[in-house]
Amino acid sequence: MKLGYGEFSWPTGEAYHGQFYRDHFHGLGTYTWPDGSSFTGTFYLSQREGYGTMHTKTMLFQGLYKEDQRFGPGIETYPDGSQDVGLWFREYLLKLCTRVPSGFSLVNYPEFLAFLTKSRRRLDLSDEKVELGLSEEQDPFFYDYKQYLLNDELKLPPEMHVYSTDNSHLPMTDSLRQELDDHIFMNEIPPFIEDEEPWLITNETPLLVKIQKQTYKFRNKDAHTSWNIPAILEGNRSRFGPSGPKEQISKKMIMKAEEGDYNWIFGILRDNLACADVADSKGYTVLAAAAMHSHLDIVNLLLDFGADVNKRSDEGITPLSMCFLQYYPCKSFHPNIAERTLLQESPKSLVTPKISFLLADANIDYLYDVGMPIAGGDELKTSSLDDSLASMQTPESSNMLHKEEVSPVKTVSTDVEKESEGAAENVDASTLYSVDTNFESTKCLRNYTINVSRDIMEKSAQAYSSLPQHPCFPYKGTVRKMAQSMVERRNRWMTITLLLRRGADPNLCQVPMQALFLAVKAGDVEGVRLLLMSGAQTDIQFPPQLQSLTPLHIAVSLPGEEGVKITELLLHVITNVDAKAADEDYVYKGGKADLLPSSLKLNNEPGPPKSFYSTHTFIPEEGGRTALHVACEREDNKKCARDIVRLLLSHRANPNVLWSGHSPLSLAIASGNDLVVKELLSQGADPNLPLTKGLGTALCVVCDLVYEQQRSVENKIALIDRLISYGADVLNPVTLVQGDRTAVGTAVDYGYFKFFQDRKIAHCPFHALMPAEREVFMARKRLLEYLGLQLRLAVLSKESRLDTKALYLSKRAELAPCHRLKKKGSSSVRTQSSEKQSIPFYKFCYQCGRSIGVRLSPCPRCYGILTCSKYCKTKAWIEFHKKDCNDIMAMIPHLEGSAWRVAESP
């Protein structure tokens, strides 16, 4: 067995002199070939491993090796002094130290900076080890003898190294690997001792991670510093000689891929002059350059020559994600309530000389809103035409901008009178017959414009874009610009489909977000369908700093029919329809009225008796928003929101979870969407679900001042009737809190509590209010009176099920404590009899329904009802109590006689 330092030669003329270990070249040594070539450096089991110098007749290579191949940073020097510098893989440059000026960078997309919250990972220095002791339940492929394969002593026969040195076909035990590494790094710091934090991963492509790990392993070698390896890793080429041929060809190939020079690239790859996976110092590859410029033939060529379709840039972006970012610009994203985005300002229209197409920029926004059919059956959606139309102005028309704004509507206004509004502010505006006029005033002039419909322009652009070649004109009009944008967009879509068909992973890149998020945010139904068919995952989320939203959260908030279609697509794949966002601390519509103290005084009132309502046996789950919460929160398109809610409920979304104190039902009430309310109630939403954060129940939300602008009083009354018809109990207890005082009441008390928060309308004399304030006062009063009526009917319904005689005696005994029966008898017997017949009843004003903050007084004749004021007493007497009181008074002698007989019975 060869061990130690020595020399060994072969009859072929090859020779090695250096360190041996277990019959292998292992350690420092020099290997020479008959042609004069030599390698001086580190060997590992008879293979070049680590830093070394390779001498040939035509060049000198200094760099890192692994398993007998170049693998990492290196410098190849030629006789003329030029050098190829970068990261090497075998005989090819894999990454340059120079940057292509036109390379892709997220710096050019500042709108996504908020999504760049993920920090770079560090190198994992520990080798993967299989843990022992996996149980049969944890390991689906468990069998009894499997653990023997995990034992170093049982992997190889004893003394295997004595009669075989073929380690390339034998398993490497952990103990042998540790022994070999100790021999290589005998006089140095062990490679994986954490004397410092591991390096940050500069590029997460698996091959480049392995290269960086190999470089880190040999970082303490002298060559690492003397050969300027850190400068290569940083992409700093200033300390090296002029670029060599391989470096020049590699850089030129990236630029040729942008230009679309297929023949030149094919010749380079055919002659093996460069690697199809080469990238600049920032990881911008040839494939990315070709894909960004939609050169499909070059993309296919590179993939045929082995380019990695999922290779990432240093920013972590794959070619597929670059294409998606280009296909879905920020302006194509729909504003939605899931992300709390705001509507953008309407763009301004342009005035062209002599003929003013009012489409101009409004035409661009139209393409964002609707899909335009293009050749091949695809659709043009969410187009980024602003950039392409930015240069459409000629020098003569560059100063002819309207001052008025044109809203992006679906049809073009034909009202010519609106043109004069902006003309007064633009003294240089052109007229139909004059371009060079320069009067001080244009009030006497009129610009007679020709309004061309969008349909005509779109059809013209569609026909023009279908031509095989477009003639070049020095000035391109709106139609040609639109046609050019259609062609570019179609090519980008074809590039995306090609990359996905050739194996691009839509889940790999998470910077700035997954591709599925981009398609959903843009409302592209076909894009979402393509990604889902390509295996895009749906259980993805935004970072916690952005509320951890899922694609379903955004899909259910999209306006229009595309939101319904995308939601349906996602629900066919998604696993957790009740995924929660990280916004559990968000306060939904915390208006000023919530901050004002109510003038209603709380005196620890007990609320309705327990026999008057049914108690909830479970505590509702509370957390972040679910997709159902988002859909019920929508105020934009009530019909589409209803359809989305129906889809979610059909996939078993839970309608009885809380967010910000609200249930989906209360959110639908607060947002004013009665269609969603009806859908939720019909699908089993609980109208009596107790809400948190002082919201009470769904009936309480109807009369909350914060949401009173969502519907008229008639609609609120109809909503109350609908809730009650689906089982809403107006007698459910509601706890009111103000400071250190609490009280328990009903939805009526909650309504009056909120009513008295607006002190001006609640307490000012009616004649002192403005007309609008009077309308508000009357509307609130009418709603509360109707709710009080429903409360009285509910109480009377409960009391009708009780013993009328016992109920009357209980009320009379409690409300008139000084009352005594006229007949003689034992007072103790009568007291015991009254206690036996005592029935709890609800003390509230039978006219307005209030039980909190009022002083109740019974009817002095019958003690059958309670009222809180003279106004309520008079109104109750007129409306309903006059007849009831007379009926009760007629029954009193009979009731008292019955009570006496009961008291006398043994």
UniProtKB/Swiss-Prot annotation:
Zn(2+) 1 binds at residues 845, 848, 868, 872. ANK repeats lie at residues 282-311, 479-508, 511-540, 547-579, 623-657, 660-689, 701-732. This is Ankyrin repeat and MYND domain-containing protein 1. The gene is Ankmy1. Pfam families: Ank_2 (PF12796), Ank_4 (PF13637), MORN (PF02493), zf-MYND (PF01753). MORN repeats lie at residues 16-38, 39-59, 61-83. The keyword Zinc applies. It comes from the Eukaryota. Zn(2+) 2 binds at residues 859, 862, 881, 885. Residues 391-411 are annotated as: Disordered. It comes from Mus musculus. One of its GO terms (molecular function) is zinc ion binding. Residues 391-400 have a biased composition (Polar residues). Keywords: ANK repeat, Metal-binding, Repeat, Zinc, Zinc-finger. The keyword Lipid biosynthesis does not apply.
